[in-house]
Amino acid sequence: MKKLLSLVIIVVGIVADQIFKNWIVANIQLGDTEKIWPNVLSLTYIKNDGAAWSSFSGQQWFFLILTPIVLVVALWFLWKKMAQNWYFIGLTLIIAGALGNFIDRIRQGFVVDMFQTEFINFPIFNIADILLSVGFVLLFIAILTDKETK
């Protein structure tokens, strides 16, 4: 049952990410900003050919090699730790987010980012980035609370 749930979460995450990215590209000009919640959140369409804070900008080969490795490792750990909920949820979200951005990199050579926080200086991000970030936080919690690793 958990395998099916993991697959559903991954597919829903990827579909939501890709649909929203396509909507952004179709409705907002590159570099333009649409206010959603003044002084809190805007939509700003950018093409990101790097990672967070534009690190590794222009190094697509790095992500095209790294992402499949991360996916294989995450899938292996998901298989081994599926019974433990923190691992299960965290790794499932990491896989969904990694695949969402990987699809962009393969299809377009860059990742579409759009969420811009206005109350803090933070990199513009997308749904896949949210999935990855939440997944890594949950994975960290899983590692800290794992009785087998203590």
UniProtKB/Swiss-Prot annotation:
A single Gene Ontology biological process assigned to it is: proteolysis
Question: In the Enzyme Commission scheme, what number(s) does this protein have?
Answer: 3.4.23.36
Any matching Pfam family: Peptidase_A8
Q: Which UniProt keywords apply?
A: Aspartyl protease, Cell membrane, Hydrolase, Membrane, Protease, Transmembrane, Transmembrane helix
- The broad enzyme category this protein falls into is hydrolase
Its transmembrane ranges are 5-25, 59-79, 83-103, 124-144
Claim: Plastid is one of the keywords in the record: no
Q: Where in the cell is it found?
A: Cell membrane
A GO molecular function term, named singly, is:
aspartic-type endopeptidase activity
Reactions accelerated catalytically: Release of signal peptides from bacterial membrane prolipoproteins. Hydrolyzes -Xaa-Yaa-Zaa-|-(S,diacylglyceryl)Cys-, in which Xaa is hydrophobic (preferably Leu), and Yaa (Ala or Ser) and Zaa (Gly or Ala) have small, neutral side chains
Where is this protein primarily located?
membrane
Q: Name one GO cellular component term.
A: plasma membrane
- Which PANTHER family does the entry mention? LIPOPROTEIN SIGNAL PEPTIDASE
Identify the NCBIfam families for this entry: lspA
Q: Describe the task this protein carries out.
A: This protein specifically catalyzes the removal of signal peptides from prolipoproteins.
What family does the entry list? Belongs to the peptidase A8 family.
| Protein name (Swiss-Prot/TrEMBL) | Lipoprotein signal peptidase
Q: Which organism is it from?
A: Lactococcus lactis subsp. lactis (strain IL1403)
